[in-house]
Structure formats: C-alpha cells, structure tokens
C-alpha cells in the first residue's frame, strides 16, 4: 500500500471569508434582555411560613385558572416549591382554595 496524502486547501483569513447572515429563518435574531434572577421569597424572609390554612399566601402561587405557578415563573427554590404544592393541594382538599376557576362564585 502506498501512502496517500490529502492536500487541504489553504485557509483564508477571517477578513476574506464571506460573511454569514446574522439571522436564521424569517427575520433578524432577537436577543433577550438580561433578566434578573428571581429570589425565593421564603428563603429571603425567614419569618414567612408556608401554611395550608393561609389561602392569601397560597393564592399568589395559583393562576386564574387554578393551576399551580411553576418554579421558573414564581422564583421559588425547589424545597419551597414542593412545600407550596403540597400546601395548595391540602387547601384544595378541605375547600379553602377552589380547585378550578369555574368553582369561584362571583
């Protein structure tokens, strides 16, 4: 077998390369503005307690449709998000919080 060498074309300088378009798809790329990381309000304020008997605190973690707000939106840490979920489910079970928005009497 004879040794074959592959000849690669010489690399061009950056300035000589054709420019790539700065967009993909239909329009220019949109950059998201920097968003500040949300802080768990229960970790920040140690006096605030998660209790299933306090529906005022729990309502801020429920959407208008009665769904539990996810952690990435509420800004809670995983420990407190689990506690909030459990407290909301307990409060729903004993009818302190409505299960869905259709159960709310206006």
Swiss-Prot record:
Keyword Ribonucleoprotein: yes
GO process terms (BP): translation
UniProt feature, compositional bias: Basic and acidic residues: 1-22
Region (Disordered): 1-34
Superkingdom in the source lineage: Bacteria
Gene Ontology MF terms: small ribosomal subunit rRNA binding; structural constituent of ribosome
One GO cellular component, as annotated: cytosolic small ribosomal subunit
Keywords recorded for this protein, A-Z: Ribonucleoprotein, Ribosomal protein, RNA-binding, rRNA-binding
Calcium among keywords: no
SUPFAM superfamilies in alphabetical order: Ribosomal protein S18
Chain ranges passing through the membrane: none
Alphabetical list of HAMAP family matching this protein: Ribosomal_bS18 (MF_00270)
Family statement drawn from the similarity comment of this UniProt entry: Belongs to the bacterial ribosomal protein bS18 family.
Complex and partners: Part of the 30S ribosomal subunit. Forms a tight heterodimer with protein bS6.
Function field: Binds as a heterodimer with protein bS6 to the central domain of the 16S rRNA, where it helps stabilize the platform of the 30S subunit.
Name by which UniProt lists this protein: Small ribosomal subunit protein bS18
The organism of origin for this protein: Geobacter metallireducens (strain ATCC 53774 / DSM 7210 / GS-15)
């Amino acid at each position: 077998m004879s040794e074959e060498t592959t000849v690669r074309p010489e690399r061009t300088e950056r300035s000589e390369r054709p420019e790539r378009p700065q967009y993909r798809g239909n329009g220019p790329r949109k950059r998201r503005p920097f968003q500040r990381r949300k802080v768990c309000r229960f970790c920040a304020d140690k006096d605030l307690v998660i209790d299933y008997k306090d529906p005022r605190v729990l309502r801020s973690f429920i959407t208008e449709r009665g769904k539990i707000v996810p952690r990435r939106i509420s800004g809670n840490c995983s420990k407190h998000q689990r506690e909030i979920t459990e407290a909301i489910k307990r409060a729903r079970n004993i009818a302190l919080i409505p299960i869905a928005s259709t159960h709310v009497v206006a």
